[in-house]
Amino acid sequence: MSATINPHQVLTFFVAAAFIRLTVGAVTTFRIVPGEGPPRRSELVSLGFWAMLIEGTPVQLNSWLVVPGCVGMVGALVLFDWARRSIRGQYFSYVFSNDIPTMLWTGGPFAYIRNPFYASYLLAMASVALMMPSLIRLLVFAGAAMLLTSAARHEERKFAQSPLSSEYEPYKQRTGRFLPKILA
């Protein structure tokens, strides 16, 4: 009796492994600001991330969207790891924290986009919604996109009010929030 490979299980394993990698990366990259707990909105993004995986809508794997979805997921992992290597073991605060920025990263993916970590999460979630389309996954992605856009704006306000504001404004003008600026 030969074992058959179930493509749905392979895809689910791939996505779960990618999500675990991103989750472990987040836990080892982001720190809670002393005196603050993790913001509830941060927890919502994390829950949405995992809800996309466990949502039980059947998947049509003959869809032509699986390949670009897998490429997007690999891209999300590469972007996340590139950003982690670029900060050289330093820690970022959790989303929506109220700390004052003390460093402006401009190397690696930060040279092109201001929020490569958020961009990698959005790319991963968009990839899952593409590979395993369902209304629930699409709604979770849309909600996460709104929350992470709000988080990015919050970070931008913190930088604008910090001692780094004179460095941040030109940086903001030459980089995109989640995607590189095409025209300078």
Segments (PLM) and residue ranges:
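Histidine-centered phosphotransfer motif of kinases
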Residues: T106-G107, A111-A119
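Membrane-anchoring alpha-helices and their flanking helix-loop junctions
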Residues: M1-T106, A124-A184
